[in-house]
Structure formats: C-alpha cells, structure tokens
Amino acid sequence: MEWSEVEVHTTNEAVEPVANVLTEFGAAGVSIEDVADFLREREDKFGEIYALRREDYPEDGVIIKAYFLKTTEFVEQIPEIEQTLKNLSTFDIPLGKFQFVVNDVDDEEWATAWKKYYHPVQITDRITIVPSWESYTPSANEIIIELDPGMAFGTGTHPTTQLCIRALSDYLQPGDEVIDVGTGSGVLSIASAKLGAKSILATDLDEIATRAAEENITLNKTEHIITVKQNNLLQDINKTDVDIVVANILAEVILLFPEDVYKALKPGGIFIASGIIEDKAKVVEEALKKAGLVIEKMEQQGDWVAIISKRGVE
C-alpha cells in the first residue's frame, strides 16, 4: 500500500484544532513534533523512551504529521484539507507561518514514524497517560490511562486536555455521573472512570471519534462504565441530574450550549469547559453566567483557559 504524509507547520495553540481536522478527513495516525517536549524537564522514571535528538524537532512552532492511505479520493481532497486548515484562522486560532506539505511514504515508515514522538505524559501527581505499546510500571496509587494515538487525536499532550484532567481530578467524586461532550479519543471519559465516576456518557458528532473512543475505552477496561453515543453536543440528552459535564472543544462551540449544560446539571453540579483560547475566555465566561452558571475558577496553561462553573444549589 502507498501512504501519504501531510505535514503542517503551525503554532502550539493550533495543535488540537489542526489535528482534529486531519482526523476528521480520515487520517490513520497523527504525530506532534514540539520542541517543548524535548526541552522540558522530565522525571527519571520515564527513562530511555526519551532518547531523542534535538534535530528531531522544529526550531519554532509545532509540526503535525498525519498519515493517509494514498487513494484517488484523498488526492482529490488535498486542496480541501489545506483550505479547511487555513480557515481555522477565522476562529481566531493563530496558525503562525503555516506550511502545508504532502509527501509519499512507504507502509513501514508511516506505521512507526509517529510513535517516537508520543511518550508517557504525567498530567498530575497521580494520573499518567501511557502509549498502549509502552511497558510502564506505575508508582503506588498512580492512575494509568492507556491510549493509542493512531486512532484519534486526544493524547493528553495538549494543554486543553491537561487542564480538563486536572479539573476532573479536583472536582470529581466517587459515584458521580458525568457527560463528556466532544469526547474525541475518549481520554476524559477514561480519566473520569478511573477517578471513580459511576457512569459516563461520551458524545461526539464525528463517527471516527466515537469509534476511536470505543477502542480506547475497551483498551482501558472501562466499557462497563462509559457509554459512547454519536450526538451533536447535548441535543436530545434528556438528563437533569448530572454531577459533571466536561467539554474540551473550541470556545465558539461552547457558546452554543450553556443553557443545555445548566439543564443537564443537578443543583451544585460542575461544568468544566476547556479548549478556550485566552482571547475568548471573557465571552465564554459571560455566556456561562447568562445561562445561570456560577464561575468557580479559571485555570490557564500557556494561551489556553479552562473555566470551571457550577449550577447553584436551589
């Protein structure tokens, strides 16, 4: 089989939306090459899996590589893929210098190339995301989430995902009922299950994402707790007693359903909203307040913001 590698040079802020677009067009795998991963300090327990060279990484920005089976349909879609990525700037997502290149690769090369850039990611002092092919010995009480990033984007490396998982760690109580809106790879649902949630509904509009989530959920043996549903946000989700709603999606999408979140939450229930670029935080905050939610706190990592809000106790 012949494969094509789509290489996009962009900003760190654009990583998640760019990778999501590539996945939605049918990418079989996505890798992220960020110099920050090379330069940041790491604990010894991650060991030799970090034996990489500085020249493996771009001088600035981030390179995202996605792998597609080279079919006539894919070749015809290349201009559409490039234009869709460029259109992300209309959502105030900074694309930086933005370079879009398509290369041919052989079967063996694509199947392994992205793996060298994906490593265990320690999100909190007790939650670590580990590639499914890596052997990893957890410390006492450490929670391990296994993911295969070849299935869909959502590996835990992006600040928005990390902000969500940290908020879940802070607010989720054993026995809680959770809805994960825009589940992607299912990482937030899996984290919720491993933190003790009683039941989780994971929704995503994209069929590729729901299939990927189901595979990762099975990999983590949490399928008895998590139900995956292809669905548009919270439409036709007739729940009114949910403890936590979590959504790691763009600010423009979050603005579409604060009222539905309010209706779904029980009094005192928590809404964790991430995927919000700093410039959009204020407008999201105001929309949440208008829907009747009370802002608990805001957390920031780089240019990304998570807003934690609550339905008041009536």
From Swiss-Prot:
Family annotation (InterPro entries): Ribosomal_L11_MeTrfase_PrmA (IPR050078), Ribosomal_PrmA_MeTrfase (IPR004498), SAM-dependent_MTases_sf (IPR029063)
SS bonds (residue pairs): none
Record: residues binding S-adenosyl-L-methionine: T161, G182, D204, N248
GO cellular component labels: cytoplasm
Cell compartment(s), UniProt: Cytoplasm
Signal peptide per UniProt: none
GO terms for biological process, alphabetical: methylation
HAMAP family attached to this UniProt entry: Methyltr_PrmA (MF_00735)
Name of protein: Ribosomal protein L11 methyltransferase
UniProt organism field: Listeria monocytogenes serotype 4b (strain F2365)
Lineage per the UniProt record: Bacteria, Bacillati, Bacillota, Bacilli, Bacillales
